[in-house]
Structure formats: C-alpha cells, structure tokens
Amino acid sequence: WARTIDELRSDYPLDLLLKLRKMARSVFYYHLKRLKTIDKYSNEKESIKLIFHEHKGRYGYRRVTAEMHNRGFMLNHKTIQRLMGDLGLKSKIRMVRYRSYKGEVGKIAPNIIDRDFTAEAPNRKWATDVTQIKIGSVKLYLSPILDMFNGEIISYNISRKPDMEQIYDMLDKAFTRFDSLDGLILHSDQGWQYQHYGYRKRLEEHHIVQSMSRKGNCLDNAMAENFFGIMKSELLYTENFESPEAFIKALDKYIEYYNNKRIKARLKGKSPVQYRTLSITG
C-alpha cells in the first residue's frame, strides 16, 4: 500500500490517503524508505536475471558476479548471492563424475605434460580424449581437442563409432585452422586410438610431440575429463533429447557457447575466445 499511496500523492493530499487507508504517517514513511532501499538494486536485479537466463541457469553466483563485473556492475559476490536469493535464482547444475571411453590401453609415449596443464600461449599444449554419451539406446562418442592455454575446444568429432576415422576427422579439422603447429605437445590417455600408427604418423607429419598419461590415472588428463564433466552436467543431464540427432545439434550450439560465452574464473572472468583474443591484442 505504501507504493500505491506514494503514486497517488501527486493527485491527492497525503493526509487524505493515509486517513482512507488508516495508516499512520510514520508507518507510511517507514515502508516507503524500505521500498526505496530494496529498489536501489532494481537495475542490478534486471541484469542478474538477464545473465542467469541467458546462460540457461548454468551460472551460480560466482560466475554471475564475474559477468556482472564484465558489464560494469561492481557488486561483491555476497551481494549478488543475496540478490539471486531474493529473485529465486539458483543454478541447476551439479557436477557429476563421468567415465571416459578407453578401450584397450598401452603406452608408446612419455608423460611429458606430467599434470602441468598450464601454457604461456595458444597452441603450445593440447589435450584430447574420447567420452561415451548415451541417448536412449544409442551410444555416441565425442572426441575433442582442447587448448590448455584457455580450455578452448579447437576441434571435435561426434560419431556412433569410436574408430580411427573419428580421430582423423578431429585432427584434420584442427590442422586446417593453423599454418604451423611445430613443437606443439598433444596429450592423451593410453587409449588404443592414440597408440595407432596412423595417429602417431599424423602428429609426426605436423611436427607435434606426443604425450601420454600414466595407465589408469585420470588426473593425468584432467583437463579433457573436466570438460566432459562440465558438458554432461550443463547439457546432457539437463535436457531430454528425443534422438541422437537432437543431441548433436544441441552439442554444436553448446560448444559454440562454451568457447565464446561461458566465462571461467581462471581466465579472469573471460570466455576462452575472449581470453585468447586479449592475449594476442594485449
């Protein structure tokens, strides 16, 4: 009622409005002050809602805070958390463990990366892996390459068969993007695909150094496995896909989103592409 009275007071005497409502002047001003205090974050709340829905509920208060900073709203994370609570906004994402597709394992290359997933520039260190995705009764296999510099998906292939054609397609897509990859390290687990002569030959032709995790040690390829966990939590487990084709279409959009819009704390609140661009342009 305080808001309504405040809106009507330009046309009617305040005393009359308070008398009709049987409200004391002190009570009116108390509620009016409280309303104005609450409303001082009205613009911020609109931006929070926009960010939250733009990212389909995938962002918790920490990422919302970082994105708010990117948009010029310099509120701390506690305030953002409180405002999100007031708006009833809560991230629907809960990270889950996953199991990647390994096949037979064996080692033909040393573990050069040795859990050092940092890189000083793009295209110094890449990681790859294969994960299985089940849509109804159909199994799909996703094989991406990630840049350790910024976590960007360089290329990927999704197929119904985890065969070498999938791996070759993924490599070819990556190789055509760059003039030279001399000295790049490409890290993987000990999956059979990465032991294959054809895989090793293609790396050799492009002067790429092969690195392999230790047997049965998922932490040695944590960067690729972390991406799979994020993708499955934010995409696969949040929607019911009617067909493998529907999932593949959604995956294409998700990877575009992941590279260009999804911000990361380790990238100083930037998306992978934004971070790479800034590293080049300064």
What are these regions (language model features)?
Residues 16-35, 54-56, 245-269:
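K/E-rich alpha-helical interaction surfaces of small helical-bundle regulatory domains
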Residues 17-21, 28, 48, 64, ...:
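Mobile genetic element proteins and their domesticated derivatives, centered on retroelements
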Residues 204-208, 230-282:
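C-terminal domain-tail junction helix/linker
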Residues 1-12, 16, 22, 38-39, ...:
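Residue-centric detector for conserved, function-critical "anchor" positions
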